[in-house]
């Protein structure tokens, strides 16, 4: 995946590589999800548990027409947007039901992002678990 990310302009590339590292680190701390698959979906770097029905796909990319922004995209038909907004509506910029918007010039809020990544990667597991 680094060979894909290396094609981005330097500031955006660095921000996306940092976000990729955060996803990989978070996944490594979640033994219940098993191995993480790193692939391309719609031309964007994408991350999801290899085993089915564990979590939902996360994608990362720059923002079209916005050279200083990038995003963590999640499945728009999931309840993740509502969940992220409930937990971190004041700490994160959540666009609709599909993305968390980040700026390449600012330090991202790591703990809220890490938690949102974990929520996505365990999405189906959590739906099946008793409350």
Kindly give the residue locations of the regions a language model identified.
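Charge-dense, helix-prone N-terminal extensions
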Residues: 1-131
